[in-house]
């Protein structure tokens, strides 16, 4: 397996503290405006859901607890949204939620617009949890259903492309099957690990030419970023999968986040890489990435099966 690039500079033992600062985010969410047009249970579901969005913003690399106020799909969407914001460390967040124009589709289903007005402390120095203050607003079209456990947010139509590049569904729409998705994630994780100088966890999930390409990309990343502390990635914006016999073709956008030394501090740069992947099913039923086409950091890949 590739061991990662040689660096002009390598983080020393003293630099181990210079990582993303671990912290417990301070989040305050309040309802305002026409909140009284909703029941207390509906209000609580919206507040809990908004708190989850803020938690994912502050800690996008950590799993969210499974709570009854929303669905697994929206939890994954929240983490994708948070990852897109994660070029910064987000500390205290103060949110006012303005519900508007609730429409009851039935006794057990309601749609409501929710305007979020957020004031957050953030830092571009990843070792700090306080810095500047940033205020922004976003509009969410929420769908709530009544379940046996109470009211649950089951839909969130939101566009924040001008803020962080997020569009509703970008993390969960048109997903391939779980086994194919796992092979894709393992392949992307391998590339990120090599770029960060880590040992890949599952190097056999892609072919030797793609492992060699990961090494070449890592060398290019050193030229771009010099000292790399960490690299994380997320797949998003999947196109519908194309299948032909024992191979499938998947088009997606990889969201790549590189923590690196910039002007004397640890900072993050986020970039997007559009991939066209080819996967082949193995004799044991698992899937292996055997082809990729992309351009990133001035590097071009055109590995065919």
Explain the meaning of each model-derived region:
Residues 8-10, 20-21, 44, 147, ...:
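Positively charged, low-complexity intrinsically disordered regions
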Residues 17, 63-64, 110, 123, ...:
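Intrinsic disorder/low-complexity detector
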Residues 107-175, 245-305:
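Exposed beta-sheet edge and beta->alpha loop/turn motif
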Residues 15-93, 169-229:
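Core segments of small alpha/beta cavity-forming domains
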Residues 2-16:
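Ser/Thr/Gly/Pro-rich low-complexity, disordered linker/stalk segments of secreted
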Residues 93-105, 230-243:
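Short amphipathic beta-strand and strand-loop transition segments with alternating hydrophobic
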Residues 8-11, 37, 86, 95, ...:
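Intrinsically disordered, low-complexity, compositionally biased regions/tails
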Residues 53, 77, 81, 86-87, ...:
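Polar/charged side chains located within well-ordered beta-strands of beta-rich proteins
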């Amino acid at each position: 397996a590739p061991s990662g690039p040689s660096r002009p500079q390598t983080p020393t033992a003293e630099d181990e503290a210079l990582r993303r600062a671990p912290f417990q985010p301070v989040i305050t969410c309040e309802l305002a405006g026409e909140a009284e047009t909703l029941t207390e249970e509906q209000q609580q579901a919206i507040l809990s859901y908004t708190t989850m969005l803020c938690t994912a913003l502050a800690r996008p690399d950590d799993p969210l607890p499974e709570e009854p106020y929303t669905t697994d799909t929206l939890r994954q969407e929240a983490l994708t949204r948070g990852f897109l914001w994660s070029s910064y460390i987000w500390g205290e967040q103060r949110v006012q939620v303005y519900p508007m124009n609730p429409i009851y589709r039935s006794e057990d289903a309601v749609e409501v617009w929710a305007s979020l007005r957020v004031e957050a402390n953030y830092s571009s120095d990843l070792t700090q949890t306080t810095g500047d203050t940033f205020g922004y607003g976003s509009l969410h079209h929420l769908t709530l259903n009544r379940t046996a456990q109470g009211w649950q947010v089951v839909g969130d139509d939101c566009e924040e492309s001008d803020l962080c590049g997020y569009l509703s569904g970008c993390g969960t729409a048109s997903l391939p099957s779980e086994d194919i998705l796992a092979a894709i994630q393992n392949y992307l994780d391998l590339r990120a690990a090599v770029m960060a100088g880590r040992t890949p966890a599952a190097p056999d999930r892609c072919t030797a030419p793609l492992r060699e390409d990961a090494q070449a990309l890592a060398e290019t990343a050193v030229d771009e970023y010099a000292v790399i502390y960490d690299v994380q990635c997320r797949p998003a914006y999947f196109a519908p999968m194309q299948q032909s016999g024992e191979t499938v073709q998947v088009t997606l956008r990889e969201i790549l986040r590189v923590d690196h030394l910039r002007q004397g501090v640890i900072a993050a740069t986020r970039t997007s890489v559009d991939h066209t992947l080819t996967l082949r099913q193995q004799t044991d039923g698992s899937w292996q990435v055997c082809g990729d086409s992309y351009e990133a950091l001035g590097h071009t890949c055109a590995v065919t099966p």
